[in-house]
Amino acid sequence: NHSYYVNHYEKYGLTSEKNFHEKTFMFKDIDTAYYEKMSRIVKTRNKLNEVNFTSTHEVMKRTNEMFDLFNKSYAKLSSFVKINQEQKEFMKEKYIKFINPEYIKFVENENKEIVAFAIIMPSFAKALQKMNGKLFPFGFLNLLWAKKFNKDVTLYLIGIDPNYQKLGVTAIIFNSFIQTL
């Protein structure tokens, strides 16, 4: 945000309760060997496996587990409200089935229980600018192209079981995404 936002809101007596930090980094700047090594160590030490999907049907079978883990991993946040079954079904139909299954990653323990998940999506910003707000006659092609062939991605959602937090599980997830992209 622009710096004057803070002054404007503080003038009216408002204060910041939470701060949001966004980080952008280039994949070419990432040391992939580090993530591969850490991923291997964390998998061995904690008896974990990554789950990669090739079809939306496979993802849909396990989305209820994912949303249960989402509720569990975000429960301690002050402003979090649990997702109920009706909302789970809505999100499955509205969002999950439109995400490329390669962009959804799970980590499971030796009992095949999901202990972590992450969802990334391609950035549609450039495609939306290119189509100039017009979906038809050919604007939708820009969206389809961006969905399949995109160099920019956004990490939309990540959740880790509280019992597995601070064990390096994110190294498994990020290594899996690095290999996918």
Language-model region placement:
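Acyl-donor-binding surface of acyltransferase catalytic domains
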Residues: 1-52
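Short acidic, gly/pro-rich beta-turn/loop elements at beta-sheet edges
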Residues: 33, 128-130, 165
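A conserved beta-strand-loop-helix scaffold within acyl/acetyltransferase catalytic domains
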Residues: 52-160, 175
